[in-house]
Amino acid sequence: MSTSFFSISRSFKRCVVSACLVLAGIGAASVSTPAAAEVKVGVSDWPGWVAWYVAEQKGFFKKNGADVKLVWFANYTDSIGALSSGQLDANSQTWSDTLGPLAKGLPLKAILVNDNSAGNDALMVGPKITSFAQLKGKKVALEQYSISHFVLATALAKNGMKLSDVKLVNLSAGDAAAAFISGKVDAAVLWNPWVSQIEKSGKGKPIFTSRDMPGLVPDLLVAQDKAIQTKRKELVGMIKAWFETEKFIREQPAEAAKIMSKVVSMTPEEYAVFLPGTKFFDAAANTQAFDARQALSLSSTAPIIAAFLTQYKLIEGKPDATKGIDGTLLQDALK
């Protein structure tokens, strides 16, 4: 994401991408137009998306009649540009990074929730801090305008505080972790593997994690309207394959970690740290996510996420989430 608000420095980096970069078609030149006989899907470095390679290697795509070509993006922002410019049929991206394009009227639809971050992102504090009240006036390191920024804003709001109650220190994730460990800041918003490493070292603990904000950090499969119309069979088959993938990860996590770790050049043991903090969505969880009546559905959480994006001028206009959600493919997959 070096072309976004900050540079990507490691694996598992997700950020809020501005709509203007998306509309510019960043990275478009590196991806060819999708072939008629396949569905071309962008994948970046996050467990819920790397899991697609489990589906590929275990034959779940073929089993469900889906001709899928996974396209790896080392730079997550590039994948969003490729989808927006029509060079992908679908892409792996966050709900927050989909609302910007929707506000601009791009013809995109969320068709599957792969996962929610459920502990991989955390607000880490020193051993002596036991309450949010003790954070008032303290230095908190994070990557500004990132998912980490959103996590902190949510954590403070849930505990009767505002961002102005703390002193923000804008650092890359790696630098934020180092600053926290060395005592230069009082707290830091980080993600795994730093969260688990700091806990094991005894230098800090999570006072709030993404597990405490269910539904607000969803990772999705987002498709072009045109692809939904012309390649519906493949996309429905892909959703069916996902449910087999989720079951495989749940029942055989060691084997899944072995497959996924190779994609990102890690050891299975290193990769296993990420699985507990990722809530992979099965059919039941997806059914709820696409039901607008549910409190944690995509429709219900969109205004909360959009408010954060608007406050920091990360999107222009007001996104109509109802135009960016299509649950009919999920319904077809469950028939």
Segments the model singles out, each with a brief description of its role:
Residues 96-97, 169, 175-265:
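Pocket-lining segment of extracytoplasmic ligand-binding domains
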Residues 38-175, 186-192, 208, 215:
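Short, glycine-/small- and polar/acidic-enriched structural segments
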Residues 303-335:
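Conserved C-terminal helix/tail region of periplasmic/extracytoplasmic solute-binding proteins
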Residues 59, 81-85, 109, 133, ...:
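Solvent-exposed, polar/charged alpha-helical surfaces in well-ordered, non-transmembrane soluble domains
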Residues 26-32:
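N-terminal signal peptide c-region/cleavage motif recognized by signal peptidases
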Residues 2-20:
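Bacterial N-terminal signal peptides that target proteins for export
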Residues 229-314:
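Secondary-structure end/capping motifs
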